[in-house]
């Protein structure tokens, strides 16, 4: 039962998104900032591994709200992440799948993009992004 609930919450990781992250990481710093909890994070890591990816391959650093004891969309979580990474919000492209978080990122100074959560639309969107990433 728990496994089924976790599967519903995590969904399937979009392979096109993972491919884009690998390409982007060749040219840019890539960070993950997530409100995920420990159980769902472990499930996501397991799914990444099953697809042949590791967090070290995809991200320079991972920031998880449960470990930081802060949560998006609070400004404190963005402040801590930028302080630890040295990121300049004005030159940082920030993707989020929740409108309130994308808007909070924009108010913080990020170039903020709201990504689609419909699996078909998201797949198509990331396919297009992949075409436009120069390697």
Regions found by a protein language model. Give the residues of each.
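Asp-based, Mg2+/Mn2+-dependent phosphohydrolase catalytic module
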Residues: 37-38, 43-135
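Substrate-recognition element of Asp-dependent hydrolases with the DxDx(T/V) motif
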Residues: 1-49
């Amino acid at each position: 039962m728990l496994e089924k609930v976790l599967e519903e919450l995590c969904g399937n990781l979009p392979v096109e998104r993972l491919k884009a992250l690998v390409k982007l990481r060749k040219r840019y710093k890539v960070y993950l900032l997530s409100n995920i909890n420990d159980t769902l994070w472990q499930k996501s890591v397991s799914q990444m591994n099953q697809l042949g990816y590791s967090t070290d391959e995809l991200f320079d650093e991972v920031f998880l709200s449960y470990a930081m004891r802060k949560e998006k969309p609070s400004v404190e979580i963005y402040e801590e992440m930028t302080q630890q990474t040295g990121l300049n919000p004005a030159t940082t492209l920030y993707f989020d799948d929740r409108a309130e978080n994308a808007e909070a990122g924009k108010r913080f100074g990020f170039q903020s993009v709201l990504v689609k959560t419909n699996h078909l639309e998201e797949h198509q969107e990331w396919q297009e992004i992949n075409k436009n990433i120069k390697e």
